Structures are given as structure tokens and as C-alpha cells.
Amino acid sequence: MTMEKKRYFSVMSEDRSPNLVTAEQNEELKNSSVSKDSQEDSLFVVDDSDIEEQTESNILENTNPVPHVHRLEYEEFESQIKSVVGTISSHAMNHLFKKYHDKQNYLKLAVQEYLQGIDENDTDIRIVGNSPDGNNSPNVHRKRIYEQEQDDLMSRLQRECQRSQDEEKKKSWNRFIGSLNVQAWATRPTTKPLKYLEKLELRRLMPKKLNVGKPTKEKTKFGDSSIIRIYTIPKYTEESGREIGRIPEDITRILVPLIDLDISSFYTTVMIDTEKRLSTGDSFYIQIDCYLSQNAFSGKELERSMSQSDQDLNALKRQKKMDTRTRFDFSTETNTEAILRLRQYSLSRFFQRLNIKPIPQKSDHADDINEASETPIIIDSENEDDHIVKEDHEQQNLDQLKQIMQANQQSELLDSLPETTKPPIFNFKLDLRKYQKHGLSWMLTREREIAVLETLSKNDDDDNDNDILTTQDKANIQERNDAFMNPLWDIFEWPKDTSMHKSESSPTEDRMDDNYFYANMYNGELSLTKPVIRSMVKGGILADEMGLGKTISTLALINSVPIDVMFEENKELEDKTIYASKTTLIIVPMSLLSQWQKEFDKANNNSNHKCFIYYGDSATTDLSPVLCNKKKDIPIVMITTYGTVLNEFTRISNRRDAKGFLPKIGLFSVKFFRIVLDEGHNIRNRTAKTSKAIYEILSNRKWVLTGTPVINRLDDLYSLVKFLELEPWSNFSYWKTFVTLPFEQRKISQTLDVVKSILEPIFIRRTKNMKQSNGKPLVELPPKEVVIEEVKFNEVEEKLYNWFKARASQSFKDGIKSGDLFKKYSQILTHILRLRQVCCHVDLVGSANEMEQELVDPNTDLSEANGESDSISMVNNVLDSYHADNNHDEKFKNNTEVRSVMFPLYEKIDLKESECSICTQSPIPLGEMALTPCGHAYCLNCVLEHFDFQEKNSQKPLCPNCREPISKYKIFKLRHRDTSVKEIRFHTKQEMEDPSQNFKFQLYLYDPTKTSSKIQCLINHLKILKEQSPNEQVVVFSQFSSYLDIIENELKIQISNDFVVYKFDGRLNMNERQKILENFSSQKHENKVMILLLSLKAGGVGLNLTTASRAFMMDPWWSPSVEDQAIDRLHRIGQNSNVKVTRFIMADSIETKMLKIQERKKQIGEAVGAEEDERRKRRIEEMQILFEDD
């Protein structure tokens, strides 16, 4: 027997009238939690004008409990059903959705059928309807019973839902944030005056229609309408209150988004009685008490908005790449982007109005930073008659940047670290200074070696109990090291509640104990918990000032933790990269390669610790056998150069596999335990090939050593952050959004605050002028004296300089006048180059040297500069013109006359008995001796000064001994070279006393047009130094190696017997450099001055030249920091003597103007200008300084 499965419930057919539900049930459903049209106790009201415009049909249409829904989304349908009936099976939900989603009363019909009965075990969901004679059926009685049960169940569900909402509302809270005193105005007359402390209500106006009667081209966006009106509070709840006024537009625009996003609530109180009832346009004063709601701190809506914004942005970028010719406006703001923008704008202005300021980060330098941002600087106007006082923003920027570099020195983390940490004695044999021990503690915490730190800090002989780490100290260190506050967030303190309205929904007692909250003013996000960034970076930036021993500090770290003890030997990583867990790779400039090896050998106290120098040999294409074998001779340190890394990367960069990985060759064949970049600012350009190569090398821990982390611009720091893989800042789009763009928009203080927060956990810098905790200097160095000595042009130099200066000034004036100065940029730079060459030596003019590359902008057109290729001929023309203007009698007519005068002088020279009749020096050194045609010997400097004295007095120069007329163009000098007697006899036709004896010197004609005033001053200083300190070691700095060549030749000619000269420049290979430095530092020559001619490019950084205490700077550079770095090669740890530096500057020349530019750079900072246009503008200003009239 077949049985049909039935449910004995009455079922509503699809064509059944919706009026089956009673009026009472309809009213209950209308007021239930699922109704969306309820406006009771809401800030959102309908514009009165819109209400008046509504037609009768619109009003009747709005009386429906639920609006007609077309193609309702399944998720919304499901959530509404579950909110009424609770849990429901998926196939039952699908049945209800398919059947009712397009019905007018879909919710009521679906709930009614479900409650009447669906057999959820029956997949066909068969429903038995009424029989034709249903009116006489016994089921009619059952139907009425179940309808009554349905009504009871619906009422119970509604009460439960309301109770749940009430409980949720009680759990939520509002907290007082401040009050606004506002002058409002009346929009309509009032029936009576307003009373003091009378309560009013703010309501956000939500018009139903926008642009009435006009076609709308685009979708209405969030926040398009900003209208807030003031209403009276009705005495009875069934009344709606009456509009009486409005608040100012600027405040409205701030409050509207806060209301729309349910961030804040506002309570209004009348503050001053109105003497009479208000008329339209009258003003009255109110106080708006402002509260932040719990919803403001949830962040869910903001996260969804940001996520959607990112998706929209990515989609737009993809679309833009697909069709670059489209006319679509990619700058169009999406609705979610508008929400974020309005939230950020409203909160920032809201806090500004309420005078809510963040609590400064704890730093001893915070006051200094604030002072730097508030102190006005008085500067001179270009117009002498117009003296004004203005704020020098650039000076503030530099001051703040300097404070940022030092602010972390007094951070809580650093203060909690011991100052007694030192490496194990069996690994490291040098003694560290106190600040180096403290720095080692910080470096160990950055590598998360807390256990090692605890062990090594107890090994100090002082046994200072105060430096022993407690359990709490270790926990605090771990917490600060692993998680630091997000730098985009600020901490705020809740203000005291001084409102006129005491909120009934104030925070709970446990929440009241929390006196602080956090805000991200970049996107308007709020939080009650400290927003932290979990950092996995093991490493940091050691930015101690030059000369404080960054090399020793790094070697101390390596010897404290030489290997990765947590790694199982020979275990491969997930990406199949071999892990060199026992080797630290140190990448250095080539000039420092031997010095690092030497420092390692000096510090190493473990015979098993080896240092390996890697040259990129073809024999070591795979480093895994060398660094990952099971033998004991694995080097703990491998040193290589930036050039080696670049060469290897260039060879293999085009051989990436399908996944983009480089082939496992050379430095890229293993993952190192640790990487150290010495002079890390070499990778400051993130787009340079060297930087890209460095980024590709894998390691577990990374360190950057640099004394100058910022050189040209603030973005120099980004490359260091990218190398360290500091998330999220290593993502350039993130860095650009929060650092680069705000900085370019001149939001300096805001940007530097972000940079300070980024650097604080990974950055440490100590300077020589810092004090220790006991008040003593961080490091006691001998005094340093820098002296500027102005040198005057000689006659020929002055003539040539003035000729080039006239051409340069004219080009500059023409460029200014025509407005195309940038087009003449390269030409003007070439003129500046010529002027600097003349200041150094006239032979440099037109020479191919590195000055050309330094001064000419590589991005400019060099076509005009190439016209200067015939500079040598121009110099000769100028010199010929000079000679033509002078008396021909002062010079020899030809070489025959020169020989006829010079060769007879050989017999008159007695080197041992020679004496200068001007200064009485005897004997006269061979290199200094000068002879007149009459055969009298003098010191060259003495006779030249004699010429100058005679010319100043308008007298004809005469020989001091015989009073014969003499000329500076008829002076002979001596040099170390043998001269044959036969040659002399051939020219003189005279018999010699001893024809077999050759002369040990050679005479030659002195040419004053080929001398350099600077070189002559240098030689004079060296001669004096030889007399005062015969065994002195001297360093001579110059920017240009070709100039050093000329200096070397002059020194060999004039003073070669008393001096030992070495030259160190970029043309030397590594072995030659090492040999020169060893000879200069270690070899001693009795009674001889040792001179090192040093190019700043090759040896301006990293070298240790503490054996020398005297230095001469032959030419200035645009950047003062370059010269400071050079001087610090001498004035550093290990220097025991007073350091004296002499800077030679040509008087009344471009070099004196360069000193002004250097001072200007010190004042405004070299990292202030971020945009290329801004930097170009600064260069033009510097050119104006160079060409201004004295």
C-alpha cells in the first residue's frame, strides 16, 4: 500500500491575498527589528521640504511594511530570515528564496510558510494544500489553532530580538572627547525665548532627492549633502520636535561624516538666554558636547573600505595599462575612497577644533624638536633696505633632522640595556669603550640574542649589579624589540568630562581606567589598544659618527654570535637555497678591503676563526662547498667589495628562471648568516644596479654601517630600509605615500615625525660631542683646529681667471635675461669648472679629468659644453696676449740666449757654501735655490717676494747683491739630475778644471706662468713643518687626481730630498693601495716628512690615518660633509696628537663664494629639497651667489 506523506498545516498558496495577516500582526512586523524604515530615536530625518513635495501615491506606497524588492541578494534574504526564525537548513532556505524573493511581502510570506511547516527531511519539500471543500474540512480547526500558535511565536521572537538589541545597546558606550561653543542662527521663528541650559538636539538632514528636476550624470556619493539642523526636544515621545536653527557650514562639514559613520554623538545645550523669542536669522549660542562612540574604535567598516579601495585602485591600474589611450578619468574617486577621505578630514579637523593634541613620544630631545619647529630665524633680505623677519623653514628642517638622528639615544630600550657587555675573551682580544659595550648590547637585542646578552653582560670585571638583566628587563626588551608602535599612530589622553550632558551610556568601570586612546590621523582610524608592528627584522643601522669605531663594534658583534646556533647544520631551506649559517658577509668599498682584514686579524683571538676575501673568481662560482661543508675551516667572515657584487649580478641578471630567481652562482648561491654593508650610503639610490644587486643577496641578519645615512635627500633612507626588509616601509608605494609625497608637499614636521618613528627601533647614532651618563665626553679626542688660509693669485693666474670669469658672468646674465637659464645650464657649469681649474693650476684647464664628470649634470645637453674642448688653445691665447702686453726686455729672446746665460752659471754654483743674502739661510736646499743671470743664489720664495716688493713700489727689480737689473722671467732653478761637462763645454767653448767630473744637478729656466700659488704655499708650509717637526706625517687632500699629479711633480722637483711622497687615488689596484697605506703608516724615515697625496673619492671615507696629525685641503667642495669626512680620517679614535687642518682658498675667487654655499648648506641642510625641480632651483640660487659682484 502506497502512502502519501502529508503535513497537517495550512499552507498559503502563491495567489493567496497578502491581507491574510491581521492588522495587529502587520503592525508588529512593521515595528520589529527586521523593519528598515523605523526612524524612532534617529538622527536621520527627512527634509521637511521633501515631505511637502511627496504625492499621495508616494505616501500610500510608503505605508507598505517592507518595500518591493527586485532580485534580492541571497545573503540579505538569508540574514533576514535567520534573524527571525534562527537556524534553518540550506535546502529549506533555497526553497524559500526561490519561491518568495521576488514577492512584495517576501519576509512575511517566507516566515509564515516556514512556521506552518516544511518537512526539512523531504528533499522535494512537498506541501499539501487545502481540498476544494476545505471550508467543511476538519483541517479548518487545526488551521486556526496553528495560526494562533504562529502569532504567539512571532510575538515571542520579536520580544527576544528587542531584548537582544537592548542588551547590545547597553554594552555599547560613548565617551566624552570635548565641547564646541558655537554661534548658531535661527531658521524660523520660535514661540518663546531659549533658556540657559535648555537641551536641544542636532539632526542630520538626509534629503530624499538630490538635484531635483535635473538629470544626474553620476552616482550620488557619500557625504554629498552636509546639512545639520537644530531641533527642540519634545516633551512627549510621540512628538517629533521642531526645527529652530542651523550651525555654521564649517562645523557642519566636520560633524556630518562623524554622524554618518556612527563615530560620534552630540548633545546640545543653550549657553546664553535669549531675551526674546527668535526671529529668522537671529543668532544664539550653544555648547555641543562631543562623544566618541564605541563604533568609532571597531575599525570593521574602515577595514572593509580600505580593502575595497585597494581593489578599486588595482583594477584602475590594470585598466590603465590595458588601454593607455582611453579617455577614462582614472583620478575619479570611488565611494569608499570618499569615505576614507571624509573620515580622515573630519577627525583631524574635529581634534583640531577640540584642541586635542597627541602626547609626544618619550624622548629627551622632544623639547628640542619642538623648539626647532617654533623658533623664528632672522635672515638678511637680498634688498638691503628691506629688513624683514621671517621663519626659515629649511633651518627648522635640518634642526629637526639632526634631532631625529639622535632622539633614539635616550629611548627606554637603550636605557634598559647594560653598558658592560663585551665579546668572549677567547674570541675577541680588544677592549671596548663603554659606549661600544652599550652599543653591542643594543646590537644583540636587535638580533634577538637575549640569552647571549645576559651571559656577556655578566662577564665584565666591574661586576656592576645594576647592569645585570632582570626577568622583567628581559621581558621588556623582548616586547620592545619584537613589536613597536606603528609610526603612523599617535597616542591621546581622554579629557576630563566637563560636559553639560552626562551620558547614560558612559564606559564601564574597567574601560574608565584606560586613560588613553590611539588615532591614525592619516586615515582616521581609532583604537583603544596600542597599534604595534610585529617586526621580524634582525639587524639595523649603526650610524655612529665617523671615527667612533663602527668597524670594531661590528667585529665585536660577529665574535659574540659567530654562527647561527639554532640552525641544523647542512639543512636546506624551503626555497632550496643553501644556508651558510657560519659566515658573515661584509661588503665594503675597495679602498677599505685590506683595512677590514687587518682589523679582523687585530681583534681575532680564536685560531679557528678565519677571514676570507672574495674576489669573484671563476674558481668559486659555487660558494656552498666553501661555506657549508662539515670541516672546521669555514670562514666566519667573508669580505668582498661593492664592485664584485655588481659584476656578478651583471653577469647573471639576465639568466633568471621562470620564477624570477637568479642562478645559484657566486654570492647568490647561498644564504648568509649575516650581511654587513660598510659605508652603506653607497646604495642610497634604489634604482642603481649596485643597490639592486645588494637587495638580491640573501641573509638571515642584516646590518648597515654609515656615518652619513642621509646625503642628498630624505629618500636616501628608503634604500637602507628596503635592504633591511623592514615591513611595511620596504614597500616603496607605502614609503612614498607617507614619507616622500608629504615631504614634497612641505609637510615637513609631519614627515619627520614618521621618519623618526620608523628609524627609532632600528637606528643608533652616537657623535663625538655626546656625553656619557657620568657627564664625561663619549670619547676623548685631542683638539682639532681648522684654519682657512687665503692665497693671492699671481699675475698670470689673475689674468686668466678674470678672462674666464667675464665669459661665465656674461653667460649667466644672458640666461637670466632671456629666461632660458636651464638651457644654458651645462655651459655655465663648464665655466664654473674652468674657474675652479684656474684656482688650482692653469695646466688643469681643458684637461680631461674627473672634475668634468662631477660638475656637469648628466641629464643636461652637453652640446654647448663640447664647445670648450679647445680650452688649451684659449689658455695659450690668453697667455700670449699677456706676454705681448709686457716688456719684451724682461724675457730671453730665444733658447740660444737662454743657453748662453745658463751654462756659464754651472761653474759659479757651490751647493755647500751657498747662502741666501735675503734670509741668510745657508746652505740653500737644492730644490729651493734660484739663480739670477749675474750668478747670485737666493731662495726662490725670497727672490719672488723681492720682485713683488719692488713692483709695489713701482721700482725696477735689481739684484740685492750687485744691483744689476733682474727679471722673474730670467731666473734659473736647480733639480736633481746629472749634467755632463761635455754638454757645458759644447755650449760655452771653455775648458773645465775636471772634464771627467759631471755636475750632480741641472739648471732650468723658471717659468712663473706655469706655477701655482697654492702649490707654492703648500711647499712653504711643508718646509716650515720640516724644520719644526722633521718626522711629521702629512696628508694632502684634493678632489682631483690630475691635480695630485701636478703636486707630486712639483714636490719631487723642489723638495724631494727632505720629503717622502706617496700618492693614493682611484687609479691604483687593491694591492697597490694596501702597500701605500702600509708604507705610510708603518715605515719611518729619519728626519724626513712623509706626505700622502690622497684623493677624496678613493680615500675620503673609511680609512684610518691616525698616524698623521697635519692635513692640507687643496680645494673646497660643494658639500661640507665631504670635507668633514676627510678630516675625520685623522681625527678619530686612536689619534694621540692635536690635529691641524689648513684649507687653501684663493682670495676674491669662486672658492670664497663656495665657502658661502657650504655655510648655506649647513644652515638649510642638504637633505631638505626632495624634488628635482626644487634641487635645480637651489642650484640656480647657488649660481647667483657665485656670480654676484663683490
UniProtKB/Swiss-Prot annotation:
Its main location: cytoplasm. Residues 1-41 are annotated as: Disordered. GO terms for molecular function: ATP binding; ATP-dependent activity, acting on DNA; DNA binding; helicase activity; hydrolase activity, acting on acid anhydrides, in phosphorus-containing anhydrides; zinc ion binding. ATP binds at D544, E545, M546, G547, L548, G549, K550, T551. GO terms for biological process: DNA repair. Residues 1017-1181 form the Helicase C-terminal domain. It holds the Pfam family zf-C3HC4_3. It is an enzyme of class 3 (hydrolase). Residues 1-17 have a biased composition (Basic and acidic residues). Keywords: ATP-binding, Cytoplasm, DNA damage, DNA repair, DNA-binding, Helicase, Hydrolase, Metal-binding, Nucleotide-binding, Nucleus, Zinc, Zinc-finger. It is found in: Cytoplasm; Nucleus. Residues 531-727 form the Helicase ATP-binding domain. Its EC number is 3.6.4.-. SMART domains: DEXDc, HELICc, HIRAN, RING. One of its GO terms (cellular component) is nucleus. A motif (DEGH box) lies at residues 678-681. A zinc finger (RING-type) spans 916-963. Probable helicase, member of the UBC2/RAD6 epistasis group. Functions with DNA repair protein RAD18 in error-free postreplication DNA repair. Involved in the maintenance of wild-type rates of instability of simple repetitive sequences such as poly(GT) repeats. Seems to be involved in maintaining a balance which acts in favor of error-prone non-homologous joining during DNA double-strand breaks repairs. Belongs to the SNF2/RAD54 helicase family. This is DNA repair protein RAD5.
